[in-house]
Regions:
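Active-site regions of enzymes building and remodeling cell-envelope glycoconjugates
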Residues: 119-129
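Generic beta-structure capping elements
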Residues: 15, 39, 74-77
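Active-site neighborhoods of divalent-metal-dependent phosphate/nucleic-acid chemistry enzymes
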Residues: 57-61, 65-114, 125-127
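Phosphate/NTP-binding elements of NTP-utilizing enzymes
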Residues: 44
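Aromatic- and histidine-enriched alpha-helix N-cap/loop-to-helix transition segments
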Residues: 36-39, 96
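Short, well-structured N-terminal submotif of metal-dependent ribonuclease cores
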Residues: 1-36, 49-62, 66, 104, ...
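A generic structural signal for short hydrophobic patches within well-formed alpha-helices
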Residues: 11, 41, 79, 115-116
Length: 132
């Protein structure tokens, strides 16, 4: 069974906006052991407080277990691993997710093309095309 770490966008799509999930990704998630980082909940909390995201972090947290996902805490080992990453991406939340993926090891699914520079621990997922 594959082990997957969802980035924040894919987490939001999976639990709040499944219609945005690209074809085939949902079945991969259903067949895998899936992790959600506590850093993603933190990111949603900050962006919601700044008015940049209309999501309730407490509700998102409550949806993790019913969705069949595992909450991955941020450890000291994860934090130290961030320092070993090349400076490909400046976003601290994304850097933490990459560090967790490399440390655990997990495959990080993301729609952020900058993360591809971190190598085979990241797989890019394109958003489902809009119907016109």
């Amino acid at each position: 069974m594959s082990r997957i770490l969802l980035d924040t966008h894919l987490l939001l799509w999976a639990v709040a906006e499944p219609r945005k999930m690209p074809p085939g990704v949902r079945s991969r998630i259903d067949a895998a052991e899936v992790f959600v980082s506590a850093a993603s909940i933190w990111e949603v909390s900050i962006k919601a407080a700044l008015g940049k995201l209309a999501a309730d972090p407490a509700e998102l947290l409550a949806e993790i277990e019913p969705a069949g996902f595992n909450l991955l805490p941020v450890t000291g080992e994860h934090a130290a691993a961030v320092a070993r990453l090349p400076a490909i991406h400046a976003d601290p939340f994304d850097r933490m997710l990459v560090a967790q993926a490399k440390t655990e090891p997990l495959l990080l699914l993301s729609n952020d093309s900058l993360l591809a520079g971190y190598g085979d621990c990241v797989e890019l997922i394109a958003r489902k095309p809009r119907r016109t």
